[in-house]
């Protein structure tokens, strides 16, 4: 019997994320010397139905310390998992879910559970001398995702008057992932010049995800600036746009309307705004176009915006129960996968498989509070996701993922860049 995969040690600590807030890092060591470590991310605009991120709510770090989550790993989770075979991912995740005993992981904290879940997979991969993407995805993992790079910021990610949160570029016309990164980087530099010329040098300061947050006043103005940046880079034919509205952030529950540029707008009117946008600009995907509980509205938007990828983030929160409801209703046609929304690797894979089985596309995503951890890069390839959003080609916690993907592409030798097939990449 091979006991080299048995978990020998689990240790957690408090470290910092890219916004200077505390987060959980976990390390796992197997008897065979395999090592895995993970730093969990944290979101700024979070869905109401996400798994619970445990914070101490005491004086240190303004109430955001995670020492309780850390001690839950060191004192509770570790005791249960020592001696378990690290290859039994589903069993290990289930043990942690049983230990927690809640629907939303509110006892131990999704940040504690996820840190261990991912670190266990990495330790098992290391013990097997396999890269993580191959350990999770096997020999079928060969699709390099088309990157959605967030280059203009609004909403919760910026201090401007822009209602929509992210304006992204996606180089579907590239021939490889490395070329896609180059196109985005050149466009980013081009956009930087456009923004500086129009709004002054102060406007090229970057937001949480590396995008620029110039003082644009309207959505149309932001899209026009973005288009100018793409044209000046020479990639008008290769690059398309994707939007993350994060509409729950500007939804007024009392009136049942949305606040756009200071005006109250109905669901139907907002869908009309999206229709005008996709006619005028090369937009192929809209994330969270409506309030997170408006499944009916999402159903209407999916029907009305024919051919456009409608991505559920706050709508689904990487949760198979909510995704199942969306599939049955025809609400959205794409799942945004954020591992920390659900809290284990097994549940994340289940959500991805459910999406694919039902004809929904998949976008693997970072959070605004990230780190140098690049696990989601491997996960995107392991799942043949076809799409990844992990910020601008700037800031180390963002480029860590793009750099890892370029390494993977080089290592794979035979791979397929999703490109124009980003919705169904295999």
UniProtKB/Swiss-Prot annotation:
Its EC number is 4.2.1.11. CDD domains: enolase. Binds a second Mg(2+) ion via substrate during catalysis. Keywords: Cytoplasm, Glycolysis, Lyase, Magnesium, Metal-binding, Secreted. Pathway: Carbohydrate degradation; glycolysis; pyruvate from D-glyceraldehyde 3-phosphate: step 4/5. Catalyzes the reversible conversion of 2-phosphoglycerate (2-PG) into phosphoenolpyruvate (PEP). It is essential for the degradation of carbohydrates via glycolysis. This is Enolase. The gene is eno. It is found in: Cytoplasm; Secreted; Cell surface. Its cofactor is Mg(2+). (2R)-2-phosphoglycerate binds at residues 165, 338, 367-368, 389. Pfam families: Enolase_C, Enolase_N. GO terms for molecular function: magnesium ion binding; phosphopyruvate hydratase activity.
């Amino acid at each position: 019997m091979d006991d080299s995969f048995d978990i020998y040690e689990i240790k957690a600590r408090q470290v910092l994320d890219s916004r200077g807030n505390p987060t959980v890092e976990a390390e796992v060591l197997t008897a065979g010397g395999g090592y895995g470590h993970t730093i969990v991310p944290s979101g700024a605009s979070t869905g109401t139905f996400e798994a619970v991120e445990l914070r101490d709510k005491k004086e240190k770090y303004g109430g955001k310390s995670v020492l309780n989550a850390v001690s839950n790993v060191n004192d509770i989770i570790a005791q249960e998992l020592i001696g378990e075979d690290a290859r039994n991912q589903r069993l290990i995740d289930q043990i942690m879910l049983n230990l927690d005993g809640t629907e939303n992981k509110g006892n131990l904290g999704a940040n504690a559970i996820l840190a261990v879940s991912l670190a266990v997979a990495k330790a098992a991969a290391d013990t097997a001398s396999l890269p993580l993407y191959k350990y999770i995805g096997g020999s079928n993992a060969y699709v390099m995702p088309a990157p959605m790079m967030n280059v203009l910021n609004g909403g919760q990610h910026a201090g401007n008057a822009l209602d929509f949160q992210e304006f992204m570029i996606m180089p579907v016309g590239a021939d490889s992932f490395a070329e896609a990164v180059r196109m985005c980087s050149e466009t980013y530099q081009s956009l930087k010049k456009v923004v500086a010329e129009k709004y002054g040098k102060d406007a090229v300061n970057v937001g949480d995800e590396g995008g620029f947050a110039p003082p644009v006043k309207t959505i149309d103005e932001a899209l026009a600036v973005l288009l100018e940046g793409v044209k000046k880079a020479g990639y008008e034919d290769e690059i398309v746009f994707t939007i993350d509205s994060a509409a729950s952030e500007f939804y007024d529950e009392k009136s049942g309307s949305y606040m756009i540029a200071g005006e109250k707008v109905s669901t139907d009117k907002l869908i009309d705004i999206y229709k005008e946008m996709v006619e005028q600009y090369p937009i192929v995907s809209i994330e969270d176009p409506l309030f997170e509980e408006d499944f009916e509205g999402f159903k209407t938007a999916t029907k009305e915006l024919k051919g456009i990828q409608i991505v559920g983030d706050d709508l689904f929160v990487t949760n198979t129960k909510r995704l199942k409801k969306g599939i049955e209703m025809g609400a959205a046609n794409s799942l945004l996968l954020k591992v920390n929304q659900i809290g284990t690797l097994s549940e994340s894979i289940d959500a991805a498989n459910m999406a694919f089985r039902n004809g929904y596309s998949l976008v693997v995503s970072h959070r605004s509070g990230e780190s140098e951890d690049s696990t989601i890069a491997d996960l995107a390839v392991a799942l043949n996701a076809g799409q990844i959003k992990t910020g601008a080609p700037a800031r180390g916690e963002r480029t860590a993922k793009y750099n890892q993907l370029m390494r993977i592409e080089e290592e794979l030798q035979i791979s397929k860049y999703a490109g124009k097939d980003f919705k169904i990449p295999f």
